C-alpha cells in the first residue's frame, strides 16, 4: 500500500455526524495509526522543505496536531491561531462567516513578523472560510502567505478555488467527495 492510500484508509467516515446528511471525516482514527500519522507529516514536510518557509501556523484545533510536527521537522517556529480569549498576550482578531452566523480567530501580535514566509496547516479544506480568516490575520501582521497544507480536501465545497483567488496554493493529501 502506498503512503497516500495508507493515510486515506486510516481516516474513518462517520455518516450523519454531526447532523443528518453530513459524512464526518474523522482524523482521530489516523492519529491512532503511527505509520499513517508519520506519513502525513512526512508528505507535508517533503512538499515544503525547499520553499523557504519561516513559520508554520496551525488553526485551532486540529491544525495544531499536524502543524506542530511539520514546523519541528522544518526547523521553524510554530504559531497558534485560536478562538477568542485563548491566547494570553496581545492579539489581533479576524471574524469570518459560517454557514449560520459568524466566528472569530485570534493570533498574537508578535507571532508573525514582516516578510515571514508562512505555511498554514489544517486538517481539512472544505469551504476555505477558516483558513482564509487565518491568512488575513497573518497578512495584517506583514507575513507572506502563499501556501496552505491540508490532510483532507472536500472538492465539492469550493475551498481550493476560494484560496486561489486570494493567492494561496493549497497542497492536499487525500480527497473525499461530498460534505
UniProtKB/Swiss-Prot annotation:
EC number: 2.4.2.7
Keywords in alphabetical order: Cytoplasm, Glycosyltransferase, Purine salvage, Transferase
Pfam families assigned to the protein according to its UniProt record, in alphabetical order: Pribosyltran (PF00156)
Biological process, per Gene Ontology: adenine salvage; AMP salvage; purine ribonucleoside salvage
Pathway where it operates: Purine metabolism; AMP biosynthesis via salvage pathway; AMP from adenine: step 1/1
InterPro entries assigned to the protein according to its UniProt record, in alphabetical order: Ade_phspho_trans, Adenine_PRTase, PRibTrfase_dom, PRTase-like
Catalytic function, reaction form: AMP + diphosphate = 5-phospho-alpha-D-ribose 1-diphosphate + adenine
Gene Ontology, cellular component aspect: cytosol
GO molecular function, one term: adenine phosphoribosyltransferase activity
Cellular location(s): Cytoplasm
Domain of life assignment: Bacteria
Principal subcellular localisation of the protein: cytoplasm
Keyword Phosphoprotein: no
Coiled coil: none
The family this protein is said to belong to: Belongs to the purine/pyrimidine phosphoribosyltransferase family.
Stated name of the protein: Adenine phosphoribosyltransferase
Amino acid at each position: 500500500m502506498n503512503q497516500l492510500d495508507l493515510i486515506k484508509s486510516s481516516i474513518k467516515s462517520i455518516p450523519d455526524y454531526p447532523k443528518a446528511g453530513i459524512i464526518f471525516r474523522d482524523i482521530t482514527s489516523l492519529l491512532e495509526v503511527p505509520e499513517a500519522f508519520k506519513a502525513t507529516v512526512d508528505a507535508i514536510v517533503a512538499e515544503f522543505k525547499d520553499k523557504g518557509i519561516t513559520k508554520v501556523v496551525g488553526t485551532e484545533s486540529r491544525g495544531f496536531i499536524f502543524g506542530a510536527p511539520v514546523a519541528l521537522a522544518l526547523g521553524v517556529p510554530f504559531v497558534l491561531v485560536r478562538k477568542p480569549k485563548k491566547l494570553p498576550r496581545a492579539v489581533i482578531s479576524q471574524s469570518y462567516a459560517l454557514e449560520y452566523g459568524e466566528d472569530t480567530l485570534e493570533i498574537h501580535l508578535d507571532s508573525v513578523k514582516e516578510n515571514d514566509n508562512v505555511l498554514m496547516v489544517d486538517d481539512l479544506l472544505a469551504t476555505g472560510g477558516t483558513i482564509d480568516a487565518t491568512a488575513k490575520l497573518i497578512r495584517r501582521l506583514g507575513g507572506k502567505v502563499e501556501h496552505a497544507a491540508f490532510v483532507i480536501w472536500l472538492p465539492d465545497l469550493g475551498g481550493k478555488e476560494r484560496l486561489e483567488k486570494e493567492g494561496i496554493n493549497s497542497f492536499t493529501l487525500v480527497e473525499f467527495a461530498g460534505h
